[in-house]
Amino acid sequence: YFIDELKNWKHLFDAAVASSDRSSDLLTSCGIEVINLNAAPPIDFYIDGADEINPDRILIKGGGGALTREKIVAAASEQFICIADDSKQVEKLGIFPLPVEVLPMSRSLVARNLVELGGRPIWREAFETDNGNWILDVHGLLIEDPRELESTINDIPGVVANGIFAQRRADIVILGSNDGIRRI
């Protein structure tokens, strides 16, 4: 969607950094050069979607399984712009299951810890991230303090990253609806 439109504007930039192998393939198929983050100059902006967005521009991302790389690229970017349809906006995060990327050997340990936090983790079987890890989708987790919960989950041994984007929230959110677009 966005990448399809981006090909019409590729004359305005030199290259792109992709946050997933799938995005990299799409960019390349549109004739856009993809460079590794390690070889990239400072990144002016990162544009991506979200699974949930609260009024403070804190997000849940990772439904596609690329949350770790998305966090890295967002952290490396001067500005993080989130575009989504208005159905993704919620008052409180947690309706969408929270993706947690884990090292394969730690899946059960991490799952037990997530249960202690009040969640119901479900292993996303037959799925491997671009980093060779697994995803636990955590249902029913009460997300009162997204920033605190993001840190708490990241501190569990074996967790690579989780899909709460509170420490690096979006700078700009653009929501589309049948009535037009609005910015948060």
Residue spans for each PLM region:
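N-terminal active-site wall of soluble small-molecule enzyme domains
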Residues: 1-6
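A short, structure-level motif marking secondary-structure boundaries and short turns
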Residues: 7-10, 95-96
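Short active-site oxyanion
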Residues: 10-16, 58
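Conserved phosphate- and dinucleotide-binding cores of soluble alpha/beta proteins
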Residues: 21-184
